[in-house]
Amino acid sequence: MKFPESLKGLKILVLGGGISGNSALNFLISEKAQPILCDRNQPERTVVPFFPDNIPPQSLPEVSLVIKSPGILPTHPILSYAADKKIPVVSEIDLGRYFFKGKIIGITGTDGKSTTTSLIAHLLKESFPDLKEGGNLGIPFTSFCKESISLAVLELSSYQLEDSSPLHLDVSVFLNLASDHLERHKTMENYFQAKLKIADLSNSNHTLIVSEKIKERILNSISYQCKLLSFGKTSDSNAFLDENSLKIKTSKFVYDISKFYLPGTHNRENLAASILAAEEIGGKPESIQTRIPLFRGLPHRFQIAGEKLGISFINDSKSTNLHSMLAGMATWKNIDQTCLILGGRPKQEDLKPLYNFLIKGIGCVVLFGEARATWESGIKNIIGEKLYCVENLNDTFEIFKKGNIFPVPGLNKDIIIRLSDSISISSFVFSPACASFDQYKNFEERGNHFLSLVNDFLDQIDS
């Protein structure tokens, strides 16, 4: 929709609080609009009228616009009422986009969005020193959309995109697509179409960057006029990832990625996408190359949680689906001495890829949370006594504490933890492959709990 040039005096309903909704609320107040908040929970203090979100819609004050928070289901009665009354419904991203005057790179995909958003911003920091990153990652767009900055790098989730009008971004990145959020989108086609809303397909001045698989899908079924670029491991990709030479080749530069810090093919593919986006928006290749080795990743994403005497712990709490976990583990070494910690609230996913991974061999698996109800039987059929089932992460570390510590022959003071006669572990990888909401507010709280348990455990090991 086209926003009025001034929001002053307009009655606008913000449906859903949270980070996004509250940011939109504050922006509307700053623009002298007359916002109304409608949410499940009443805030302790608010300077605007509040209504519970289960109120009969006809009891709400008359408004000219609804701003929907991404967590609100499309079937909410207030949204149906707005549609009947022809009241426009927009997203917080729509609101920010209308008032922002700089260039925008948007990033979406099932996995890797946050890392890629942060990586693109990192690569462009010299070329665009005033840039800001945000959206679904960190800072809501409306909290800085009226600042005089040259570039915004935005992570955009499918929830945000399905609510948005055409965003007319300068560069869009669609990383990958795997089964996720089907409780919301119902089908993979709906999920794909929500993600694809990031693209300005009919605009020849727009650049859409996609994986090889998504490019093939677009070429086979979708009409487009935008500039379509791909990244991947085939030589005809616009950003060709050569795993043998550790180079990424574009039409403008050959990048040395041998000192790129993040492990795994999936992270190198994210880097290839990031390089293309950085080039397309105007980043200088020499500057991009200089910054590649300096990126250290984000917390809770295959982060080293602790190391001592050859024992290592990895915190990958951001892994909230099987696709993410399997991508991280694809190049993991010493798998037969690795304890994989899985669990939480599982999503509607095919478990065959998990079984195919485990059948190749694993040190052991600890399974916790709600996932035990649906995952235990299938995993046990494959790895038998190498599966431990517990209630929570605290119980997980009780298993580790009961293990016996043995020195590794010929390796100075290095040790291994023997959990049973047949299970000896040197690496503990926390990559849950499930949502956190059965026991935690979010994946960050879950990851921080894991980090604290790791610190306590390693403190008890004598040097």
Curated annotation (Swiss-Prot):
Q: In which pathway does it act?
A: Cell wall biogenesis; peptidoglycan biosynthesis
State a single Pfam family of this protein: Mur_ligase_M
Q: Name one GO biological process term.
A: cell division
| Amino-acid positions noted as binding ATP in the UniProt annotation, renumbered to this chain | 109-115
Annotated localization: Cytoplasm
Q: What does this protein do?
A: Cell wall formation. Catalyzes the addition of glutamate to the nucleotide precursor UDP-N-acetylmuramoyl-L-alanine (UMA).
Q: What is this protein called?
A: UDP-N-acetylmuramoylalanine--D-glutamate ligase
Organism per entry: Leptospira interrogans serogroup Icterohaemorrhagiae serovar copenhageni (strain Fiocruz L1-130)
The encoding gene: murD
